[in-house]
Amino acid sequence: MKKNFVSVKSKKNILICILFMQFFLTAHAQEGRHVLKQGFTVDFFKQQIQEPADWVPYPGINKSMAWNYILTPGHYAKLVQQAEGLLGYNWPVTRASVFLDYAENGNRTNFEKISFSRRDALSALVIGELLENKGRFMDDIVDGIWSICEETFWGVPAHLSYQKKGIGLADVNDPVVDLFAAETSSLLAWVSHLMGDKLDKVNPLIKERIYVEIDRRIFKVIEADPKYRWMGYGRKNVDSTLSYKERSFLERRPNNWNPWISSNLLSSVLLLEKNKDRRAKFVYQVFDVLDNYLDPYPADGGCDEGPGYWGRAAASTFDCLDLVKMATNDKFNLFNDSLIKKMGEFIFKAYIGNGYYLNFADAVSKTNHSPMLIYRYGKAVGSATMMEMGAFLANKNNGLVNMPEGYSFLRKLPELYYSNELLTAKSAEPLIGSAWLPDIQVMVSRDKESSTKGLYIAAKAGHNQESHNHNDVGSFMVFYNGKPVLIDVGAGTYTKDYGKSWVISSAFHNMLPVIDDEVQQTGRKYSASNVSYVRDGQKVSFKQDISKTFNDSFGLNKWDRTITHIKGKSILISDSYEFLTTKKNIMLPMMLVALPDISVPGKMVVKNSDDSSITISYDPKQFEIEIEEIILQDSKIAHTWGSTLYRAKFNMKNITKKGKYTFTIQ
């Protein structure tokens, strides 16, 4: 069988019971609390924030000797060597023709590769000079600063929709603030702050130019209150006359762009702005924006964008709070807030083992989080598990020889400064036995706490307009002995037509029914109902009705799904359905990383790479099975899963208006 999207070939005595009739009921009750501004006024920030010249969050060039005592000799030498490799760096040009690639053919990689490499180089050169302080990297640093200041736009072409004239070339008269304009602003602000007088000795206009460009491109734009969608203001005042699709899009709560950009805005203004009044108002304004992110945030701390985005969602929120805490000498401190703690702890609840994480929605199964970031966040909120997780990841990765990805000094400097503390901290892999996140409606359960041995299942309910949404209400993933068996394919490579990608369709998520070629629909109303979670001893049960994920007119009255995990024994997937009209075809997919053995009717055996195996049992009188081989053409997916995936298609026999079945995994 051939498909257009890929090459395909046919082949749980404590009882906790929570019933949710309406998704996000708890979370919505939280709206309007404005956590960050309780007692924190513009005047507070004016009085408490230190002057840029007095604030020394990390040793700058005038105290460069401190780094000799902070870093190990090996770490120090590696960082200097990285800078040495950039001596005489030929700063690549960001050409207009390459900038236009996105508008013309959807390619964003060509430009981004050039832009990011320039910033990576500048960051590495500054680290080298900061450690060594001999002046030999200064020419290249100045060239990098000037080169970046000369760019028409600090962001990327794919984000020019914020520009009045739309995508294409950047309008110098209409600077917009996207992720990477904000990142670049923060980079240059840190360079100015760290290098200080050393830049003035080359020429006083260098630091002046940095301020002028940040003021023009960032400060004044934000002060004009542009109400960008990432700021989260629009969702409160949506025109009721708009179509459902348009309203749904506008009503979505802001995603990771909000705290990510906010953290860079805060570092820029705290490091550069000398005017007390302006600085205080700007900080207050940024926190007003961040409140739009926190107010509707799920009260359970769950990140519906997935663990892959946690580093720029909850963790960027941490960056914001930590920056201002430092800048006010701890007068501003929100780390005792329960939501902030839960947001951080999501990361270990989403950890499966062996480097794998939950990857519902547009996330990847394996992601490299900064061990230091997890450790520091855990230390700030008093989470021993987070601290132990950070130390575990650091030791697993052979310490902190490598810097975190990207060019953010907001992340790199603490990574260096606290490195010895992290490497000597208590460590443990965070293998929790079970968890239930009621607001994002995600459950996880493993056979044995603190061990990857045996079965692990994660499942979700929710709705089909979650951040970075895939149509996956009712889906689940199964691991055995820490290895993936039934998977969520996860994120693919972003393109202009990514919204139409096969990875988003429910037809490629575990046991989500395809009924007469109809699949789950996209939108907030397409959601799970009658959701409940019960844990009783060694038995965990998760129930939901997924019928509302189809159009009302389709005639699906109910599709009740119960997932039961009997720890140490088996996982049961039990469904019962009811149609108002007769249906001809029902197919249940399962996504696999290995070719299964289906030689015995009623059994599908899936072998792991360690030669262990699990058996998925079904009634052969109810289903016949066929296997499709999916040759992966998306390099991002292939990087995670290899070149090939398999889709088991369970085709129902003798379809009636009412029915039920059970699949057993053991």
Q: Residues of each region from the PLM?
A:
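Active-site lining segments of carbohydrate-active enzymes
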Residues: I167-G306, L416-S427
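Bacterial Sec-dependent N-terminal signal peptides
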Residues: M1-G32
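Carbohydrate-active enzyme catalytic cores, enriched for enzymes
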Residues: A314-L486, V534-D536, T640, N651, ...
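Solvent-exposed loop and edge beta-strand segments that line ligand/cofactor-binding
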Residues: W55, G106-R118, L130, K165-A181, ...
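CBM-like, beta-strand-rich accessory domains located in the C-terminal region of large
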Residues: A27-Q30, H159-Q163, L393-N402, G492-Q666
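Well-ordered alpha-helical scaffold segments within catalytic/enzyme domains
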Residues: D120-R136, A182-V202, I261-K276, A315-D330, ...
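Structural helix-adjacent loops and short alpha-helical linkers that scaffold large soluble proteins
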Residues: E129-V142, V191-I214, V269-F287, V324-I340, ...
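Helix-terminus loop motifs that line ligand-binding clefts
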Residues: G85-L86, G135-L179, E183, L294-Y309
